[in-house]
Amino acid sequence: MAEKKDVEINSRADTLDLMHPDIRPWPVTPPPSPEEVAKVYARRKAEDFGKWCEDNLKYEYCFGKPEALQGMRFVCVGLWRLGNKFAGGLLCEAGAEVINIEPPEGDPLRQLTPFGRKEYMLESKITGEKCGLDFIHEMRGQKSVTLNLETEEGKEIYKKLIGMSDAVIDEMPAGYMDSLGLGYRHLSNEFPRLVYCNVAVRGTWGPYKDKTSKFGQWTLEPFGGCANAFVHNTGFPQDQLPRESGGSPTRSGVWFADFVAGEQTANTILAALYWRDEFTGEGQFCEVTGAETQMDILDFDISWYGFNASIKARTGAWDPNLNQYEWNPCRDGYMMIGGQTDRLWYRIGMCIERDFPQFGRLIHEDPILKEMGGRNALEMLIKTYTLTTRWLRDINRIEAEEKLLEYEIAAG
């Protein structure tokens, strides 16, 4: 067996000789070849579907019916981030006109594609330029303009555009727009009705605001996901996934901090516009941070720390707050079971008891299991999850799902 050792990752080249399963820093799944992808596309008639989309989902169709935000215009400015684009997409879906400002060389996000595979990119019929699918997806319904904000001409054009807009979504590094004379404190003097929302990972005024590269491109998940326990409690406990000192945490599979921040940015802007149009007639500066928005959705984690100053431990597939709510392995895969209510809990017991009488006896013999608060104790979770796992390991996914759904249990 290869020697296990700590790995300091500096570049892809540094890790090429570390890809042995026992020492590689991450599981690498090779992407399918272009030939394999072409076969799947042909089988699914992907080209026909693409043509249908081009004919039926044209941009001009966006305004074919009255929309809630029709007539409103928003300006987005930001590089290497999806938050401003996700927020713009939500506003655009409600009928607004959203204009993204890109530098002359374009937003670097245009170049992102899985494993650097150019065949996963779309090519413009007009310019021949290739663009990653994720950028196109997040830019749905929006417009892009090229503008160099670091030139006097670019600044003047930007101000004219702001004068015709309702709100700005700014996801540039803290202080960057101010350094150009284009921040809220500058624009609000000329446009007092302007709503200006900054969306960032670390905010615009705290002690961490300046700890970022020029456009903040490598801080999204590392800070937004790690500073608030999101990454820490996502993964398996130490005894289930040993790696020298214990189990490894797991990052979100998507740029979670930016998407949540983008959603709250859209909500924040709508609230500010309502306040302006219904009450004061004045705009305002708003701020959304990726780290804080993830704190909002950490359910029990904040209170967990507040009650006993402990950080919630990793529990893998089990939810420590509900009995049962987990996925567990079965004979040919995995099965998710949700039993968060008394009704579902007892139905789980009735279902498993048919094949596994021990589960039913456990419920009858231990009165603590009959009450939600009691059965969520660690000892009770271990008892019931252990029996559920034993039941699942002897049946396949189809059998498990059919039996659980027969009792109207949330499963799949």
Where are these regions (language model features)?
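Generic secondary-structure signature for well-ordered alpha-helical cores
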Residues: 232-238, 271-279, 293, 299-300, ...
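Glycine-rich beta-alpha junction loops
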Residues: 105, 201-203, 290-295, 332, ...
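Beta-strand segments within the central parallel beta-sheet cores of soluble alpha/beta enzyme folds
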Residues: 74-75, 282-291, 361-366
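A short glycine-threonine-serine/GTX helix/turn-capping micro-motif
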Residues: 249-260, 283, 315-316, 323-325, ...
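N-terminal helix-loop segment corresponding to the beta1-alpha1 unit
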Residues: 2-279
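Aromatic-enriched alpha-helical interface/lid elements that frame and gate functional surfaces
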Residues: 324-411
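Substrate-binding/catalytic subdomain of NAD(P)-dependent oxidoreductase enzymes
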Residues: 218, 267, 272-316
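Active-site Gly/Thr loop motif
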Residues: 308-325, 398
